[in-house]
Amino acid sequence: MNKGCGSGSDSCLSSMEEELHVLAVDDNLIDRKLVERILKISSCKVTTAENGLRALEYLGLGDPQQTDSLTNVMKVNLIITDYCMPGMTGFELLKKVKESSNLKEVPVVILSSENIPTRINKCLASGAQMFMQKPLKLSDVEKLKCHLLNCRS
């Protein structure tokens, strides 16, 4: 079913390039900039947030008075978040997104520098689309875009 996707096939990428808007969440500036750069190289529109609370604010879940939450939700096709962040972990962000009626369909990918099977399983069981090892690579983004394309078709 994934023919050509794992190899970076242009057909998989080209059909999503126009629409994929990613919210990238990481407390580490260097990691956040790396993710942003790789996503932009892959023709994604990128919005960044330095922590889970900022991400929730952007998505309209942080401030009850925020009125443009649906506008942002419609624009975000994917959330990529670091697992380990102060204040709110990527797992907690994942749970908030999946609890929201407006956001539960938005795929969430968790990034971590630690390969801990129980953590990975917990995230996947709670609705994460994928769990990826840091550092994020261009080939990871290509596979992810193809995976999302297959899920939508």
From Swiss-Prot:
Main localization of the protein described in the UniProt heading: nucleus
Subcellular location: Nucleus
Entry GO MF terms: phosphorelay response regulator activity
SUPFAM superfamilies (UniProt xref): CheY-like
InterPro entries: ARR-like (IPR045279), CheY-like_superfamily (IPR011006), Sig_transdc_resp-reg_receiver (IPR001789)
Residues where 4-aspartylphosphate is found: 82
Domain Response regulatory stretches: 21-149
Posttranslational modification: Two-component system major event consists of a His-to-Asp phosphorelay between a sensor histidine kinase (HK) and a response regulator (RR). In plants, the His-to-Asp phosphorelay involves an additional intermediate named Histidine-containing phosphotransfer protein (HPt). This multistep phosphorelay consists of a His-Asp-His-Asp sequential transfer of a phosphate group between first a His and an Asp of the HK protein, followed by the transfer to a conserved His of the HPt protein and finally the transfer to an Asp in the receiver domain of the RR protein.
Entry keyword set: Cytokinin signaling pathway, Nucleus, Phosphoprotein, Transcription, Transcription regulation, Two-component regulatory system
GO term, biological process aspect, one: cytokinin-activated signaling pathway
GO annotations of cellular component type: nucleus
Transferase keyword on record: no
Source species, domain of life: Eukaryota
Family: Belongs to the ARR family. Type-A subfamily.
Stated role: Functions as a response regulator involved in His-to-Asp phosphorelay signal transduction system. Phosphorylation of the Asp residue in the receiver domain activates the ability of the protein to promote the transcription of target genes. Type-A response regulators seem to act as negative regulators of the cytokinin signaling.
Protein name: Two-component response regulator ARR17
Lineage of source species: Eukaryota, Viridiplantae, Streptophyta, Embryophyta, Tracheophyta
